[in-house]
């Protein structure tokens, strides 16, 4: 659109009959012949599939076993050809073809055992959960240039005379997460509520010896509006006082294999007269990568009055995040590169929310 709006309108709207190439305004910066740009072939094909299923079995009264599984697939085909008879094509080595393929597979499954019963004024709900998930990613791309004809476009890469180091690449990554969780909830007479949770997660992204994290939490609540002495206050529909404390973990900022020392090819050299690929250290490894943990305390009041026409919620919230994941600047030497992802720093936050 920019080239169409900014291109010199006095230039001819056909190819130069002597050269067979679209005329370009050589004085313009990043403004190309818009008619020539129409000859660029650019095609993207994306596929997305999501399948999930759930099975529930009642073992005995109040005790249920539930299994859930999901699979998500995503792929992208990116195909592009810049012909040799436009300025962009001549700038990219007399025509350029590019192919890229990316594929992602996500698999998740869990088993959940839930028990819920009421005994007079007592109500209990207990849950045990086992969950596993994996994600794999594959990418490849190839780029060639030097095309004497535009007939093949991107359908015949070997028709391009030139391919430079790094123009053909591929990579694959995979990570897994395994979780165990248990929760117990107890309510007495619809007035007093106690909830306790324990969770243990293991991530393949983290350093050896630091892959597992333990994350407990607990909360209590008093539903004061259900007390006998509150019944005379008919304009109050709900009055609940609650407090909770818990620990959560984060490892999303970490890429697969970031705790390891990775090698990557960086060229070729002659060994005994034969071309041999050379490798180098690709990044700073950090075998001490571990879970970032957030410790949270919350106390609050929920109030609803006049048939819930008026609602009020007030909270005091405080949290401390420890072992924060951040990319820090490091000295060279002893490190190979100037930056590294590490667990450092602490952040505290407190607020009152109404």
Which ranges hold each PLM region?
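Acidic, glycine-rich flexible loop segments
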Residues: 1-34
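Extracellular/periplasmic, surface-exposed regions of secreted and cell-surface proteins
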Residues: 22-82, 92-352
């Amino acid at each position: 659109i920019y080239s169409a709006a900014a291109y010199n309108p006095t230039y001819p709207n056909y190819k130069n009959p002597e050269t067979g190439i679209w005329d370009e305004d050589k004085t313009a910066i990043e403004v190309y012949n818009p008619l020539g740009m129409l000859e660029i072939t650019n095609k993207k094909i994306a596929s997305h599939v999501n399948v999930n299923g759930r099975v529930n079995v009642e073992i005995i009264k109040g005790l249920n076993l539930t299994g859930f599984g999901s699979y998500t697939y995503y792929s992208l085909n990116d195909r592009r050809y810049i012909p040799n008879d436009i300025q962009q094509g001549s700038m990219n080595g007399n025509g350029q073809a590019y192919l890229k393929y990316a594929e992602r597979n996500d698999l998740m499954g869990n088993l959940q055992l839930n028990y819920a019963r009421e005994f007079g004024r007592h109500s209990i709900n207990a849950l045990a959960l086992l969950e596993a998930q994996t994600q794999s990613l594959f990418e490849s791309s190839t780029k060639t240039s030097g095309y004497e004809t535009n007939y093949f476009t991107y359908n015949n890469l070997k028709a391009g005379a030139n391919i430079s180091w790094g123009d053909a690449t591929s990579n694959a990554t995979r990570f897994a997460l395994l979780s165990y969780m248990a929760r117990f909830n107890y309510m007495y007479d619809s007035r007093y509520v106690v909830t306790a949770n324990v969770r243990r997660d293991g991530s393949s992204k983290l350093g050896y010896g630091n892959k597992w994290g333990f994350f407990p939490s607990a909360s209590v609540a008093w539903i004061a509006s259900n007390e006998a002495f509150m019944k005379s206050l008919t304009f109050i529909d709900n009055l609940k006082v609650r407090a909770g404390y818990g620990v959560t973990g984060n490892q999303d900022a970490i890429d697969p294999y970031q705790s390891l020392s990775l090698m990557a090819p960086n060229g070729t050299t002659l060994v005994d007269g034969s071309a041999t690929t050379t490798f180098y250290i690709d990044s700073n490894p950090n075998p001490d990568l571990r879970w970032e943990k957030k410790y949270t305390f919350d106390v609050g009041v929920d109030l609803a009055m006049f048939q819930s026409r008026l609602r009020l919620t007030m909270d005091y919230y405080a949290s401390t995040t420890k072992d924060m994941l951040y990319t820090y600047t490091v000295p060279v030497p002893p490190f190979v590169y100037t930056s590294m992802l590490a667990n450092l720093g602490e952040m505290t936050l407190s607020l009152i929310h109404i």
